Amino acid sequence: MKKAIVGALYLLCVASQPAAAQSLLNAHETIDIKVSIWKVWDAVKDFDGLNTWHPMFSDDEIKSGGDNEPGTIRTMTVKDGPSFDEELLSFDALDKKFSYRVIDPAPLPISDYVSSFQVIEGRRGYTTILWNSSFRNNSDGKMKDEEVIGFINNAYKIGLENLKTTLESQ
């Protein structure tokens, strides 16, 4: 009887924590841009500047911190949509990369989101951007894992393609 009660309590605890049991998902997008690495880095390096090149965001405002210092918090506002906060985790100007996380809870179908963004030398005359993240599906069953990954990849693709078009036309 005691084993049955312990077993039932264990199952109840596991069932009541579905988000914790979900595995991490990964999204990634890359793009090659035919401009110098310095021009690309200059366009993307400011933690509070995503809305200047990503058309999905209408505003990007620093709440605390600043000057690309780890711990800086920004509020992102989706065009005609919700707002959510992100924290800068690391910033390396020399290697042209930074990482950040979405502060949970956020009005998005994800949780535990951590992302890295890096600008590197590409093939001759090109610069490559690498945008990667890991996260959990937090859509309450409304989206399959593949759909959530597609949602994030599509957001990356829209931003990177807009950046490419803008920089290559200057």
Regions found by a protein language model. Name each.
Residues 4-15:
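Sec-dependent N-terminal signal peptides
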Residues 36-37, 43-46, 84, 148, ...:
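Stable alpha-helical elements in mature extracytoplasmic
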